Design a protein with these regions (language model features):
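Aspartate-rich (DDxxD/NDxxD/DxxxD) Mg2+/diphosphate-binding motifs
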Residues: 59-78, 108
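Alpha-helical transmembrane segments and adjacent TM-loop junctions that form the membrane-embedded core
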Residues: 9, 78-257
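Residues at the start of alpha-helices and the adjacent loop-to-helix junctions
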Residues: 8, 22, 33-35, 51, ...
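Acidic (Asp/Glu-rich) catalytic motifs at the cytosolic membrane interface
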Residues: 19, 32-65, 103, 164-178
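Histidine-centered active-site/metal-ligand motif
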Residues: 45, 71, 248-251
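Topogenic membrane-insertion module of multi-pass membrane proteins
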Residues: 1-26, 31
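Alpha-helical transmembrane segments of integral membrane proteins, especially early/N-terminal helices
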Residues: 5-15, 44-57, 81-94
């Protein structure tokens, strides 16, 4: 069962890594040709995402280590540690760095976006690839969401850190590319690079917001959270027996994914 979960979670990670490598290469080519602030931010975003997926694969390998005297419950929580590192990288290297780069161009909008239609083509290519990766993540969420929870509740209660990260990254990638497309079009038709720089700032803020959400979730999992609401109800229902007059209190902790 655990092996099946690991394979499922890692499938979305590998799909996202492949997508981000392709998209990162195309975005850097687009930035080199156009000088677009939004394209630079998107390029940084994709490189950070590639590093994040590699960290998740490392964490998954460490989490699969066998039980030992030193770690009698295994090392599965290593996933949460690496996931927290990923959230920090997404905030600082992806979001904060991108905001700083774009803000510089926002207040000094002397740059011009060149080869606009080539940039648009690269952004559309990236949008298609990232959408495919996002569909893989959504498919895995549906497979794991056996209780039929809403998407928001599933994300809040899920103990599958790799799924949370990939869904957040792919969602930000799709939204970020749409923002970059909008900024590039506005800059082209108004001949004003302000909109390109503004879209870069918005993309950076989007990444910072996603990183903070992920960091909050993984911090809780790393220090220890109770089981999900539905699992707790199942545990309590097991005590609904005639020989038990009253259930006073139940304390639980989720040890690992």
């Amino acid at each position: 069962m655990n092996e099946e979960k690991n394979k499922g979670g890692m499938m979305s990670v590998i799909a996202a890594l492949g997508a981000n490598v392709l998209v990162a290469i195309s975005k850097f080519i687009g930035f080199a040709i156009s000088g677009s602030a939004a394209m630079l931010n998107e390029s940084i975003h994709s490189i950070v995402d590639c590093g994040n997926e590699i960290l998740l694969l490392v964490g998954n390998k460490q989490a699969a280590a066998k039980v030992s005297d030193k770690h009698p419950f295994g090392q599965a929580r290593a996933k949460y540690f690496y996931s927290l590192v990923v959230a920090m990288m997404l905030f600082f290297a992806g979001g904060a760095l991108g905001v700083m780069e774009a803000t510089e161009k926002l207040f000094h909008p002397e740059h011009n976006v060149e080869n606009t239609w080539l940039v648009m083509g690269i952004l559309v290519f990236g949008l298609i690839v990232e959408t495919v990766s996002l569909r893989v993540a959504i498919k895995e969420i549906k497979a794991l969401n056996k209780d039929g929870l809403s998407l928001y509740r599933f994300l809040r209660e899920s103990r599958h850190s790799e799924i949370l990260i990939i869904f957040a990254e792919d969602s930000c990638a799709v939204l970020g590319l749409l923002i970059a497309l909008g900024g590039t079009l506005l800059s082209h038709f108004t001949n004003n690079p302000f909109y390109d720089a503004l879209s870069g700032v918005l993309i950076g803020l989007l990444l910072c917001g996603a990183a903070l959400f992920l960091a909050r979730e993984f911090y809780g999992l790393l220090i220890g959270e109770s089981v999900t609401t539905n699992d707790l109800l199942r545990i309590k229902s097991a005590f609904n027996r005639t020989e038990i007059s009253k259930l006073i209190n139940v304390k639980t902790i989720h040890l690992s994914p």
